[in-house]
Amino acid sequence: MNKFLPLLILIMSPLLASDVITQRQDSMQDFNKLMRSATQSLKSGEIDGLSQIYDDIEAIMINYPTLFPEDSFDGKTKASKNIIDDRSKFNQISSEAAEWAALAKIAADNNDLETLQQHHQNLYGSCKSCHSRFKN
């Protein structure tokens, strides 16, 4: 059994990495849908439902950095290996996005449309910042 454990790990590693790639792609698709919904609501001046949307976005961004283990950059992925080289910056951008989402949620709870729009723009800016550095 002990002889087969390293072989089993070697065989399973790409499968696990592939699963993580799928998880992060699914997570980003969920994030994109939520951002589109939030943008549409803001354009129409509708605040109802935005609190939950930003709560969901915050949860995604808190978890997102865990979906990029070092062995998950081969195969069908658009994630840049720069994430490995600059993990602290990647984590910082994700953390800032979570903070912007939390602040947007508070503004939505307070029916403060102007502040909500500012936090939404900052959240959107974090997307651009991350993609320009860490997406192939």
Regions found by a protein language model. Give the residues of each.
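Positively charged n-region of N-terminal signal peptides that target proteins for export
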Residues: M1-F4
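Short helix-onset patch at the extreme N-terminus, typifying the N->h transition
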Residues: P6-I9, Q23-R24
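Hydrophobic h-region of N-terminal signal peptides that target proteins for export
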Residues: I9-A17
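Processing junctions and N-termini across compartments
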Residues: I11, Q121-Y124
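Extracytoplasmic c-type cytochrome modules immediately beyond a signal peptide or single-pass transmembrane anchor
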Residues: S18-H120
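The canonical Cys-X-X-Cys-His
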Residues: L123-K135
